[in-house]
Amino acid sequence: MDRIAIVDLGIGNLANVKKALKGYITSDPYEIEKADKIVLPGVGNFGAVVDKLAPIKDIIIEGINEGKPFLGICLGMQLLFEESEESPGKEGLGIFKGKVVKLKNVRTPHIGWNQVWIKKECKLFEGLKNGSYFYFVHSYHAVPQDPDIIATTTDYENAEFVSSVCFENIFGVQFHPEKSSKNGLILLRNFRRL
C-alpha cells in the first residue's frame, strides 16, 4: 500500500483527509520524503502558510519533480502557483506559472456547495458526473497562465473561476473533498488509487 503523507502545517482539521486517504499526518521532512504521495491541505492566509511551509518547501518540490502524485486542497492548490494578491512578496511553490487573486464582484467568502464543470479529462474525476457538487470555502482563486492545466471551473454569482488543476502527477482542488460527501470520497479514492 502506498504511503500517503498529509502535510500538517498546524492549521485545519486533517482527520477527515487522513481517514479518506488512509494516510499519515506529518510535518517531518523525512516522513514527507519517504512518502509515495503527498497531500497539502490548507486553510488560512497564503503568506502565513508560505512561512510555515518554508522548512519543507524544497522536499515537496523535489517529490513533485520526481513524479510523486501530489494533491493540493484549497489553499494547498493555491500554493502550487507563484504568488497571491493576499500576501504580496510571498512566493508559493511555483510549480505552475500564474497567480492567486481575490474573487471579484461577488460576496466573499464563497462558502457552500457548488458545481464543478469538467474542462479536460483528469483521473481525479473518474466516476464523477460533469456538474457534480463540491463544498467550497474561499475568497481567492488561482489564475493559471497555461489554460491546459485547468481541469474544472465553477460559476459563482455569474463569475467563473478555476476550481481544479491537473497536470501529469500534480492535482489541485479549490474545494474541500473531505467535506464534500460522496463526491469528495470518490475523488480522494481516485487519488489514493493513482
UniProtKB/Swiss-Prot annotation:
UniProt-listed CDD domains: GATase1_IGP_Synthase
Domain of life assignment: Archaea
Residues covered by the Glutamine amidotransferase type-1 domain: 3-194
Subcellular location: Cytoplasm
GO molecular function: glutaminase activity; imidazoleglycerol-phosphate synthase activity; lyase activity
Keywords on record: Amino-acid biosynthesis, Cytoplasm, Glutamine amidotransferase, Histidine biosynthesis, Hydrolase, Lyase
PROSITE patterns assigned: GATASE_TYPE_1
Transmembrane segments: none
Annotated SUPFAM superfamilies: Class I glutamine amidotransferase-like
Coiled-coil annotated residue ranges, if any: none
UniProt cross-references to InterPro entries, sorted A to Z: Class_I_gatase-like, GATASE, Imidazole-glycPsynth_HisH
Gene3D superfamilies: 3.40.50.880
Pathway: Amino-acid biosynthesis; L-histidine biosynthesis; L-histidine from 5-phospho-alpha-D-ribose 1-diphosphate: step 5/9
Example of a GO cellular component annotation carried by this entry: cytoplasm
Catalytic activity: 5-[(5-phospho-1-deoxy-D-ribulos-1-ylimino)methylamino]-1-(5-phospho-beta-D-ribosyl)imidazole-4-carboxamide + L-glutamine = D-erythro-1-(imidazol-4-yl)glycerol 3-phosphate + 5-amino-1-(5-phospho-beta-D-ribosyl)imidazole-4-carboxamide + L-glutamate + H(+); L-glutamine + H2O = L-glutamate + NH4(+)
Entry EC no(s): 4.3.2.10, 3.5.1.2
Record-level GO BP terms: L-histidine biosynthetic process
Active site: 74, 176, 178
Function: IGPS catalyzes the conversion of PRFAR and glutamine to IGP, AICAR and glutamate. The HisH subunit catalyzes the hydrolysis of glutamine to glutamate and ammonia as part of the synthesis of IGP and AICAR. The resulting ammonia molecule is channeled to the active site of HisF.
Assembly information from the UniProt record: Heterodimer of HisH and HisF.
The protein's name in its UniProt record: Imidazole glycerol phosphate synthase subunit HisH
Lineage of the organism: Archaea, Methanobacteriati, Methanobacteriota, Thermococci, Thermococcales
Name of the gene: hisH
